[in-house]
UniProtKB/Swiss-Prot annotation:
Subunit organization: Part of a tripartite efflux system composed of MdtA, MdtB and MdtC.
Family: Belongs to the membrane fusion protein (MFP) (TC 8.A.1) family.
Coiled coil ranges: none
Region (Disordered): 33-53, 389-412
Key words of the record: Cell inner membrane, Cell membrane, Membrane, Signal, Transport
Protein's membrane topology: Peripheral membrane protein
GO MF term list: efflux transmembrane transporter activity
Major subcellular site: membrane
UniProt xrefs under HAMAP family: MdtA
Name assigned to this protein: Multidrug resistance protein MdtA
Highest taxon of source: Bacteria
UniProt key word Transport: yes
Length: 412
């Protein structure tokens, strides 16, 4: 029984020894078959990352070069598109609406016929006024002929002086009647003209407010249609009161200030116009001031009551040092960036940021054009550490990026 146990333990030990030898053989063979790292480089780690002198993998980072650009300075505010002019087209006379001469949404010119009121009664009134005028003109002409005869007869005492004066008064009276008749004719003609309702301004016609055949009057507040002038069109937007001095200073420079209208999401520029005016008082409730910009809007990109984001260009900073916004970091001591030297070693530089948006930021101090800054992989960095500069390509493993030479050193 004891000998049997010894044999079983011996067999198990032999199996373990054989398995260990096989593992050592295949492991040593796989190691010798792999390529040796290049001289001066550590062995590659998982994913192809290079190792340092003591076997530690170099941190992969992405980098960008600081550039020198002309950077515009914008003041931004929320705005609403408003028509340059809005007119409710109403009838000036009472009558039946015979016809409409526009398509809803159509662009019209000032003077274009929009609607026609039944002119029948106004034609009759004009004819009556013209008839009365003709009658009174004949009376005046007869009175003047009589006056001429009286002036001759008074010289021979065939008529008295009083009769002459009476005739002169009759001529003056008849002349006054004719003037009144002429005014009545003009009034009747004006009433007739008003049966043709025309566009008072250039603009876009809205939806009709009344249908053909309805009796309308000059007192109707609804009107026939609303006309809005959209060529040009305005944008009214607000800025905080702290921006007033900047706007006024830019206006005093004597050049037109450009205003951009962006969509609700602030991702697409809709149109570009010019600042038209600045309101004369601040809204005490909101602490803001209203501004109005005008756009040609020939492409009809802006529509009345549309919400937009307005950007007012007040200045352009020349020769500004610009880096990607992702490179700018914030720490306990303020803003900083990680700068790469020619050996791909990183160092932390304190900087003073200036104008910035979601993509770029201007560095007012602490950096020079040509400096390389880290934009990704920042959380793995330590002062003086050597890194691997890579570029990320969609769907592929990051590859080493070509090193860009440039001016280095902090900008004071």
């Amino acid at each position: 029984m004891k000998g049997s146990n010894i044999r079983r333990w011996g067999a198990a030990l032999a199996v373990v020894i054989i398995a260990g030898a096989a593992y050592w053989f295949w492991h040593d063979r796989g190691t010798s078959g792999s390529g040796a790292p290049a001289a001066g480089q550590g062995p590659q780690g998982p994913g192809g990352a290079r190792h340092g002198r003591f076997g530690a993998a170099l941190a992969p980072v992405q980098a960008a070069t600081a550039t020198e650009e002309a950077v515009p300075r914008y003041l931004t505010g929320l705005g609403t598109v408003t028509a340059a002019n809005t007119v409710t087209v109403r009838s000036r006379v009472d009558g039946q609406l015979l016809s409409l001469h526009f398509q809803e949404g159509q662009q019209v010119k000032a003077g274009d016929l929009l609607a026609q009121i039944d002119p029948s009664q106004f034609k009759v009134a004009l004819a009556q006024a013209q008839g009365q005028l003709a009658k009174d003109q004949a009376t005046l002409a007869n009175a003047r002929r009589d006056l001429a005869r009286y002036q001759q007869l008074v010289k021979t005492n065939l008529v008295s002086r009083q009769e002459l004066d009476t005739q002169q008064s009759l001529v003056v009276e008849s002349a006054g009647t004719v003037k009144a008749d002429e005014a009545a004719v003009a009034s009747a003609q004006l009433q007739l003209d008003w049966t043709r309702i025309t566009a008072p301004i250039d603009g876009r016609v809205g939806l009709k407010q009344v249908d053909i055949g309805n009796q309308i009057s000059s007192g109707d507040t609804t009107g026939i249609v609303v006309l809005t002038q959209t060529h040009p069109i305005d944008v009214v937007f607000t800025l905080p009161e702290s921006s007033i001095a900047t706007v006024v200073q830019a206006q005093k420079a004597g050049k037109a200030l450009s205003v951009e209208a962006w969509d609700r999401t602030n991702k697409q520029k809709i149109s570009v116009g010019e600042l038209l005016s600045l309101d004369n008082q601040i809204d005490a409730t909101t602490g803001t001031i209203k501004l109005k910009a005008r756009f040609s809007n020939l492409d009809d990109a802006l529509f009345p009551n549309q919400f937009v984001n307005a950007r007012l260009l007040v200045d352009t900073q020349q020769n500004a040092v610009v880096i990607p916004a992702a490179a700018l970091q914030m720490g306990n001591e303020g803003h900083f960036v990680w700068v790469l030297n020619d050996e791909n070693k990183v160092s932390k530089h304190s900087v003073t940021p200036g104008i910035q948006d979601s993509q770029k930021v201007v560095i007012s101090a602490g950096l020079s054009a040509g400096d390389r800054v880290v934009t990704d992989g920042i959380d793995r960095l330590t002062e003086g550490a050597k890194v691997e500069v890579v570029t990320a390509s969609s769907g592929e493993q990051a590859q080493p990026a070509p090193r860009q030479s440039g001016k280095h050193g902090a900008r004071s």
